[in-house]
C-alpha cells in the first residue's frame, strides 16, 4: 500500500486537524402536534406497522414505512396516485416561528420530500423575504453575496463541493434524513473554511414521532441502516404491547 510505504515521511491529516473552524451548535426544536394531527399520525402508524412481521423487516421495507411516517411528521403525505395530501401545519408553523426568531438572519433550509418544498415556498410567500430553491450555480453565488434570505435545498443536491459559508450560518432541518453522509455533508456547506460565525443546526422534531428516532440515530453516528430497522421494531413492539 502506498500509504504504508510513505508513512515514515508523510502525515495524513483531516481538515479538522489543521483548519480552525467556528463552533457548530445544535438546536433541537420540539414540535407538538395538535389533537387532530396527533390522531392522524397515530392512526396511520397503527395501520402501517401492525401489518408488518417484525422478523421479516428489511432495510427496504423499513425505509418505505418510516418514510411515510416522516412525511406525516412534516405535515403531508403522498397518496397512492402520488398526490400530496396535507394533514397538518404544525411543523410549518414551528418553522415560521423559528424564522421570525432569527430576526432577518439568513437560513439554509433542508427539506426531504417535494411536498415539503412546495408547502414551504407557499408559506414563505406571505413574508417579505427573498426565497430561492437551490437548483444551479447562480444560487450559490447569490446566496454568498447576501441576495437570498431563505435558501431551500434537498441535502442530496448540495453535498460535496458546494460552498455556502459566506451567505449565512443557520441551517434548518425541516425534513430529516436517515442518511448520515447526506446529513453531515449538508451541514458542512456552512461549517467550512471561511465561515466567520458559529454555525447553528436547527432540527424541527415532532414529539412522539419518527423524527425523534432519526435525530437519535444521527447523533449516535452509528449504522443508520440498522438504526432504521431497530426504530421500526421498537415502534411495532410498543403498538403490540
Task: Give the location of each predicted region.
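Inter-lobe coupling linker of SF2 helicases/translocases
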Residues: 1-84, 88-97, 101-105, 201, ...
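Short alpha-helical
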Residues: 36, 115-116, 138, 159, ...
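Phosphate- and divalent-cation-binding pockets in alpha/beta enzyme and binding domains
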Residues: 40, 116-120, 160-163, 182, ...
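A generic "structured core" feature
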Residues: 99, 108-112, 123, 142-143, ...
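Conserved helicase ATPase core of P-loop NTP-dependent helicases/translocases
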Residues: 106-110, 115-160
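Conserved beta-strand segments of the P-loop GTPase G domain that flank and frequently precede/overlap
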Residues: 110, 153-154, 173-175, 204-205
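A short beta-strand element within the Helicase C-terminal
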Residues: 163-176, 200-203
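A conserved SF2-helicase RecA2
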Residues: 178-241
Amino acid at each position: 500500500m502506498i500509504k504504508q510505504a510513505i508513512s515514515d515521511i508523510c502525515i495524513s491529516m483531516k481538515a479538522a486537524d489543521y483548519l480552525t473552524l467556528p463552533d457548530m451548535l445544535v438546536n433541537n426544536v420540539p414540535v407538538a402536534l395538535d389533537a387532530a394531527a396527533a390522531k392522524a399520525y397515530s392512526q396511520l402508524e397503527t395501520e402501517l406497522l401492525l401489518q408488518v412481521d417484525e422478523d421479516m423487516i428489511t432495510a427496504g421495507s423499513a425505509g418505505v414505512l418510516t418514510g411515510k411516517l416522516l412525511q406525516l411528521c412534516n405535515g403531508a403525505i403522498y397518496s397512492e396516485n402520488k398526490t400530496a395530501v396535507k394533514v397538518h401545519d404544525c411543523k410549518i408553523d414551528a418553522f415560521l416561528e423559528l424564522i421570525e426568531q432569527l430576526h432577518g438572519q439568513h437560513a439554509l433550509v433542508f427539506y426531504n420530500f417535494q411536498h415539503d418544498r412546495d408547502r414551504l415556498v407557499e408559506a414563505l410567500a406571505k413574508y417579505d423575504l427573498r426565497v430561492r430553491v437551490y437548483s444551479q450555480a447562480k444560487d450559490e453565488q447569490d446566496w454568498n453575496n447576501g441576495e437570498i434570505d431563505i435558501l431551500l435545498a434537498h441535502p442530496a443536491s448540495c453535498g460535496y463541493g458546494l460552498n455556502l459559508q459566506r451567505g449565512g450560518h443557520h441551517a434548518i432541518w425541516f425534513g430529516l434524513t436517515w442518511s448520515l453522509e447526506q446529513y453531515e455533508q449538508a451541514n458542512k456547506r456552512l461549517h467550512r473554511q471561511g465561515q466567520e460565525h458559529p454555525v447553528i443546526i436547527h432540527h424541527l422534531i415532532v414529539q412522539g414521532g419518527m423524527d425523534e428516532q432519526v435525530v437519535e440515530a444521527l447523533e449516535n453516528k452509528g449504522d443508520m441502516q440498522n438504526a432504521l430497522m431497530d426504530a421500526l421494531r421498537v415502534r411495532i413492539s410498543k403498538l403490540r404491547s
